[in-house]
Regions:
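Glycine-rich nucleotide/cofactor/substrate-binding loop typically near the N-terminus or early
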Residues: 82-154
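N-terminal regions of proteins, emphasizing targeting and processing segments when present
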Residues: 22, 27-28, 36, 40, ...
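Acidic, Ala/Val/Gly-enriched low-complexity intrinsically disordered segments
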Residues: 4-7, 11-12, 27, 32, ...
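N-terminal glycine-/serine-/threonine-rich phosphate-binding loop
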Residues: 44-100
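Alpha-helix boundary/capping residues
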Residues: 20, 70, 138-139
Length: 154
């Protein structure tokens, strides 16, 4: 394992959530390709295929590689302000969180994804018919992958 990746406290972190799995990466440059290959190879069987990714990051270094690999696998993106603009600048379509929630970003951009349509899509239990019926009733998209990092609160 790359020793610099274990430095603590990390200067920046990226959290990947995949259907109840969590991967924490501290060194984007070293792990980007490795982690994206892992995510795709271990999650892209038809039963666990990543179809939609919620992406909202402050530090965008290395994000282009992740987005490109996911786009190549047919993943659709859902994102917030600056991250959405970044994804679109790479030439990939991206749906705005605000369009899904019908609610604007508030408190200086710090509150964007705290909404039942977002959390419902992440927490939906795909094997439970009651959950599937509710997300269909409320038009909540399933969110299979979440990529976020920690906002530098000062």
């Amino acid at each position: 394992m790359h020793k610099e990746a274990l430095a603590f406290p990390p200067e920046e972190s990226t959290l990947f959530f995949i259907n109840s799995h969590l991967i924490i990466t501290y060194d984007k440059q070293y792990f980007v390709t490795l982690r994206v290959k892992y995510l795709i190879s271990n999650s892209m069987s038809e039963s666990k295929r990543i179809k939609t990714a919620l992406v909202s990051v402050y530090h965008k270094e290395g994000l282009d590689e992740i987005i490109t690999k996911l786009h190549e696998e047919g993943v659709e993106f859902l994102s917030t302000g600056g991250t959405r603009q970044f994804i679109e600048s790479l030439g990939y379509p991206c749906k705005a969180v605000e369009d899904l929630t019908s609610y604007p970003s508030i408190l200086g951009g710090r509150v964007k994804t705290l909404h039942p349509k977002i959390f419902g899509g992440i927490l939906c239990r795909r094997g439970l018919e009651q959950d599937i019926q509710q997300i269909e009733k409320y038009e909540i998209p399933e969110i299979d992958l979440v990529i976020v990092d920690l906002y530098p609160f000062e």
